[in-house]
Amino acid sequence: MLVALDEDGQVFNVLENPAPQGRFCCPGCGGLVRYKSGKVLRSHFAHVTLRDCTYFSENESAQHLSLKSCLYSWLINDEQVELEKCLSSIGQVADLFVNNSLALEVQCSSLPISRLQVRTQAYHEAGLQVLWLLGKGLWLKERLSKLHKQFLSFSMNMGFHLWELDDEKKELRLRYLIHEDLRGKVHCLTKIFPFGEGNLLEILRLPFAKQALSHLTCPLDRDLPRYIAQQLYYKSSNWLALQAEFYSRGENLLTKTAEEWYPHIRLPRSAIGFAQIQTDLTLVYQDFDQYYGNIEDKQKQVLYPPIIYRKPM
């Protein structure tokens, strides 16, 4: 942790006061903490004795400490920001609490989906916004995991999106227009923002700002029928379930051509919903299906922000 309470009960921040003196305690549980400074982990506080503290973790990584420090330095000149703000009313600590309304959470490692849902819901029920920024262990690669889907946000101008933090390159990344193809591979665009350049809150609001709209062009996956045949041969549960559904209608997956599977690339879906998205997406999916259902040239697929699908063709 980067903050502690001094003997007068005042918050002490090691980023602003690098040489603390005296006794300090945890802002969450009240237990004694010790100031530490080493070569691997940046200066921080740690509990003197191992005990159950539901607010702060004892195995905080160097990456997590560094990223919180970078974001704090980026925000402090433009916004009211509190580092590791203890929100006792909801039993949580916000990594950074901005303008008394926005919690920025730096998540560097996996966590149970149920835990993410509970933490997000607690913020929402308290009338607070929360934005999760993902460290290296959770960066988006070729596939969207079930956990990734629970970090997704949504806007009409940038579609499904999420944020990544790179401590080595010192940059913030916006992965947007996130789609999945029928093989489960991710298709998206990326914007990069170097740490400290520009107003961070304005950057984080970008998905909802008025802007020139982007698009992404992908060729038709002509090898898709062979891929589906392989999946059925190896008894993929998802494809077997879909084949059973087709059989019930007197159809067969193996007789469909690549063009008949159009669009090959689709919006992410989640059977349990999306923890970060409170908007009803029913019309978004309907607009998407209707738009591509009217496309005659199926040799390519151009992916647009959802606002485009709502406009008459």
Q: Model-derived features: where do they sit?
A:
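Nucleic-acid nuclease catalytic cores
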Residues: 126-158
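A short acidic/basic microdomain associated with nuclease active sites
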Residues: 72-90, 96-99
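N-terminal cysteine/histidine-rich coordination modules
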Residues: 1-76
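Short, charged, amphipathic alpha-helix that recurs within catalytic cores of restriction-modification
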Residues: 115-128
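Acidic, metal-coordinating catalytic cores used for nucleic-acid/nucleotide bond scission
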Residues: 89, 111-112, 138
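Conserved catalytic cores of phosphodiester-cleaving nucleases, focusing on short active-site segments
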Residues: 96-112, 123
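Non-catalytic C-terminal interaction segments of nucleic acid-processing enzymes
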Residues: 152-313
